């Protein structure tokens, strides 16, 4: 079971009814089921903030010391490493519950990127959601090898939902 809490702090998000708990649960489940280790976990929790430039700017400055708006910020609750996902369940202990973390999305940045890159807004959001969930479970893109692994997973998951590669 995946519990999703969504906070919409910006009215423009309400125009995108298809971005809802059901979609976020479906995407999250698709990502997690790719890793056998997560199949033993009974309950996952994820918090989503749908906000605007002012708030994402504040969060980015506060947590990353970067004074710039960004499309999405991921705040993992666990110190997971993607390589551990392929090993035994020891990295999770005996837990049957995991709070994956928090993700904050900025409407204006995502909207502008969608327009500039000629992408459907919802599809771009889904890509960013997948990308963020991968960050929450320990994936990163600090070097080319990590970036390739992460991008290939994103492309595979997007393809499952009928969305073409953003790369």
From Swiss-Prot:
Q: Which residues form a coiled coil?
A: none
Q: Which cofactors does it use? A: Zn(2+)
Enzyme Commission number(s) from the entry: 3.1.-.-
Q: Which Pfam families match?
A: YbeY (PF02130)
- Spell out the subcellular localization from the entry: Cytoplasm
Enzyme class, first EC level, given as a word: hydrolase
| GO BP of this protein | rRNA processing
Keywords for the protein's UniProt record, in alphabetical order: Cytoplasm, Endonuclease, Hydrolase, Metal-binding, Nuclease, Ribosome biogenesis, rRNA processing, Zinc
Q: Which GO terms describe its molecular function?
A: metalloendopeptidase activity; RNA endonuclease activity; zinc ion binding
- Positions bound to Zn(2+): 131, 135, 141
One CC-aspect GO term = cytoplasm
Q: How is the cofactor bound?
A: Binds 1 zinc ion.
Name the HAMAP family on file: Endoribonucl_YbeY
Stated role: Single strand-specific metallo-endoribonuclease involved in late-stage 70S ribosome quality control and in maturation of the 3' terminus of the 16S rRNA.
User: Which PANTHER family does the UniProt record give?
Assistant: ENDORIBONUCLEASE YBEY, CHLOROPLASTIC (PTHR46986:SF1)
Q: Which family does it belong to?
A: Belongs to the endoribonuclease YbeY family.
Question: Which named protein is this?
Answer: Endoribonuclease YbeY
The organism of origin for this protein: Rickettsia felis (strain ATCC VR-1525 / URRWXCal2)
Traced from the root, the source organism's taxonomic lineage reads: Bacteria, Pseudomonadati, Pseudomonadota, Alphaproteobacteria, Rickettsiales
Gene from which this protein is expressed: ybeY
């Amino acid at each position: 079971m995946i519990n999703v809490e969504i906070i919409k702090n910006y009215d423009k998000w309400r125009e995108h009814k298809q971005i809802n708990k059901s979609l976020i649960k479906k995407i999250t489940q698709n990502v997690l089921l790719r890793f056998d280790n997560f199949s033993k976990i009974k309950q996952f929790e994820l918090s989503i903030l749908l906000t605007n430039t002012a708030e994402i700017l504040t969060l980015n400055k506060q947590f990353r010391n970067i004074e710039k708006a960004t499309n999405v910020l991921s705040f993992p609750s666990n110190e997971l490493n993607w390589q551990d996902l392929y090993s035994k369940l020891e990295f999770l202990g005996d837990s049957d519950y995991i709070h994956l973390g928090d993700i904050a999305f900025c409407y204006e940045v995502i909207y502008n990127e969608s327009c500039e890159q000629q992408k459907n807004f919802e599809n771009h959001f889904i890509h960013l959601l997948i990308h963020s969930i991968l960050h929450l479970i320990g994936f990163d893109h600090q070097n080319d090898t990590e970036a390739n692994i992460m991008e290939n997973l994103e492309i595979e998951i997007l393809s499952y939902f009928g969305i073409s590669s953003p790369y």
